[in-house]
Every structure is written in C-alpha cells, then in structure tokens.
Amino acid sequence: MTVSYQLDVSSGNPLLFLRLLGRWRGSIWKSVVGDLFVWLLFYYAIYFAYRYAFSKQLQTVFEEISIHTDDRMKYLPLTFMLGFFVTTVFERWRSALNVMPFIESVALSVAVLLPGKGREDRLTRRAIIRYVVLHQILVFRDISMRVRRRFPTLKYVVDAGFMRQEELDVLESVNQESSQTYWVPINWANSLALVAHQQKLIDQPTAFNNVIFAIKEFRVAMETLIKFDAIPIPIAYPQVVFLAVRVYFAICLVSRQFLISDMKSKTQMDWPVPIMTVLEFIFVIGWMKVAEVLLNPLGEDDDDFEVNSIIDNNISRGMAIVDTTHGYHPDLVDDVFSDPNYLPAYSENSQIPRNLTGSAAKVELAAPTDEVKIVRVNPEDAPPTSERGSMFTRRNAYSLRNRKISIASNNLESPSQERKFNLSMPAGMLNKSTQPDRPTMETVSEEHEPSHFYRGDRVHSSDSGLSKTQQSSEESVDKKG
C-alpha cells in the first residue's frame, strides 16, 4: 500500500516533522535497519579480532592498511553516481505515474455519446467499460506481481466477473496464434462501438470518432507501461552504482576502525561505536534504497503503485457512470450564488482565506488627490538599454573612430569639430535642442553642405566639383609640365 504522509507535512510545525520521522512503513529506518545490522556485525567482528586476536605485527599491518584505505576513500564518487542515478530513476517513475490510466475519460465519453435508454444501449456501454478494464488486467498481470498474485490464471479473471467463459475460450484461441493478447479486449470494445454507430445508437461520425479516440488513449497509456517494464534502465548502470556503494562500506569496515597503537596514526578518541560512519551509512544506503524502490513502481514495496485498487476503482466508477447514474441530473433551480449579497461561507474552525494580490498592489506612491506632472518622453532621446549601449550606438562609434583616423592621415581639420555634427549620423541621433538651425540628413543639399566634407575615404569641397586630392594631383602635374 502506498504510504500517505501529506497530512504530516501540512505545515512547518517542528512536531509534525518529528511525526514524519516516526513513520515506519516505507521509511528509511525500515529500508536500512537490516543492512545496518549486518554491517555492524562485520564491523565488531573485525574490531575484536584487531584488538584481542591479532599479534603486534598483524596489528601494525592492519593499521597500515586502514590508514591507506581511509586516505583513498575519496576515489569513489558516491555522491556523483547516486545523484545522477536517483534523478534518472525518479524521472522514469514520474513518467509511469503520469501515464497510469483511469477509466473516467472513457466512461464519460461513452455515456454522453451513446445516450440511449434501451437495454441494448445500456449493455453496450457496460460491455465497452468491462472490456477496457479487462485489457488493463491482462497488461497488469504481466508487469505487476500484485495483480499476478490476485489473478494467477485467467480462470480467476472469469471468476471475478471481468470476463465470461465464452470470452475466455475466444481469448485462448487467439493466444495460440499470438503470444500476446492484450489487444483483444480493445478490439472487442471498438467492434461494439462500430456496431452501435451502424445501428445509429451513436448518431454522428464525430461522436463515434471521439469514443474510439478515448479507448485509444487508454490503450496507449497501457502500452507505455508495457514499454516501461520491458525496457528498463541498462543493467550495467544500477550494477555499478549498487556495487560502488557496497564496496565503499565494505572498505569502511577496515578504514573506519579506531587505531590503538603508539604510532602517529593513533586516533585521538577510542569510541566503541563509529557514530559518524553509522550516520553516513544510514544516509547513503537510504539514498540508494530510494533508487531501488523507484526502479520498479509496479512491484511489491510499501511505496509501489496500488494497481489492484486502480482496477477495482476503474470497474466500479466506470459502471456507475455508464449505467447507475447515466442520464440523471438534479432539477434546475436557482442557486445561492445568484444572490448579489452572497458572501463566502466557512466553518468556524477553518482558516480565513487570503486573496491573490500582487506584491506591489498595496504600495501607494501618490494620494488620489495629488497632482502628478506628466512628462512627454521622446523615445529617440532615451538612453541606451545597457551600459555598453545599443548595437547601433557601438557601430556608429566604430565609424566615427575610422573617420578620425582618416582625417588624421590627411592632416585635415575634423569637420565634426567645425560643424558640430557629423553628416554620417542619421537625423534621429542629432541633438536638435542645441543645434536648432542645423539641417538634418533629409534636408542637406548643396547650399547647406560644408566647405569640405567626407564621402567615403575622399574629402570633397563645395567650391568645386573636384576633390582636394584631385586638385593636388593636377597641380603636381602642371608643375612637372
């Protein structure tokens, strides 16, 4: 039976924590006590042999071995291996829990989409639910020992009422042709739904598709559990983890002994009980036991899934939905919530609820009567979004740096210093407040151009169509001429 302890941790009261530690079923104490008892037997056997049976020479050799192994215990990365292993096993355990199928979705779909009140309608609904649960039983018999013990043979399934004798005969005849017959009850349920659709018990094709889809989802969930059981974690992984943990504490039988010689290796305290090693044993072995339990959640441990209870609940709830309570609903009357003066009701001992409010909802930065000045902000004047500036700002700074290098190489005065702005910058980057009369890029024309400016890597002059480099080259040609 799954151990429920949610009530014990319903609050942070320290006494509730003590109640949680006091649990026995499924607890760390129950998992570790047997291993700890065996380990202590071996520990004290070596303890008495070392102190009372060994000679001085053997004691010296034993102490050297103890010191050597104790210094190298860190070579076994137990925390690393157990951490990854438990995480992997827990993810598989959670996946198996999430796909565990319940009958409600199938039963509600069948009850709504096959709404007839006749005897054939009623028997069809009940048979579909029974076949779906029978499919679940056949799967659980092969992957769960608890269900296998409940139904050792298919004859027990017939005696429990989940299957009739003639249905068992058909199932056994199919079993001679196929090794697995999980699909047979699902095929029966689909065939019943098809016949109901052909006889107009299920009117619309979309309704028929919805019934088939609900049955399919149940079958897919059971197929996932079959894969979970048939394809486990590669066996080498749990082997190396379980072996490493047990080898570690086997070495501790020697390395954690209290030494009594006069050597420098003599321990400062001589305790008869290795308290710290026992605590380490409880925590590490308990951690490993968690992984062992989670490896097969369909087993027979205290914390494994209650699959027999799931089967019983599925058949009882499914039949209640499609038959016992089918088509019934209470009379329509006005409810108390329609009263505008209605207030939520709580028992006298219950806790008053707290509404969900934002963390800054009750912060008052201004009174309702305060006059708050609204300032219009131009997005173009906003500072960069980070200390390093935007990508455009960094790219523009890089182009300005290249321009300064080009100006210095030509020994010319920087036009940006002369005109107070740079023609390569877009209009949005210009400071319009300090340069109201300066033209922007959109309004720059020949009459507004500076006396000399850059276009690419050449300096042009507005006085003539030739660049200064071209004029200087022509002058040198005239002189040579």
Curated annotation (Swiss-Prot):
Record field: transmembrane: 28-48, 96-116, 231-251, 275-295
Top-level taxon of origin:
Eukaryota
Q: What is its subcellular localisation?
A: Cell membrane
InterPro entries found in the cross-reference section = Bestrophin, Bestrophin-like
Which pairs of positions does the record mark as disulfide bonds? none
Q: Which residues lie on this side of the membrane: Cytoplasmic?
A: 1-27, 117-230, 296-481
Which residue stretches are annotated as topological domain Extracellular? 49-95, 252-274
Tell me, in one coarse class, where this protein mainly resides.
membrane
Q: Show the GO MF annotations.
A: chloride channel activity
Q: Where is the composition biased (Polar residues)?
A: 462-474
Record key words, sorted:
Cell membrane, Chloride, Chloride channel, Ion channel, Ion transport, Membrane, Transmembrane, Transmembrane helix, Transport
Its topology with respect to the membrane?
Answer: Multi-pass membrane protein
The question of whether Amino-acid biosynthesis is a record keyword is answered with no
Q: Does the keyword Lyase apply?
A: no
Task: Say which family it is in.
Answer: Belongs to the anion channel-forming bestrophin (TC 1.A.46) family. Calcium-sensitive chloride channel subfamily.
Task performed by this protein: Forms chloride channels.
What is the name of this protein? Bestrophin homolog 17
The species this protein was found in: Caenorhabditis elegans
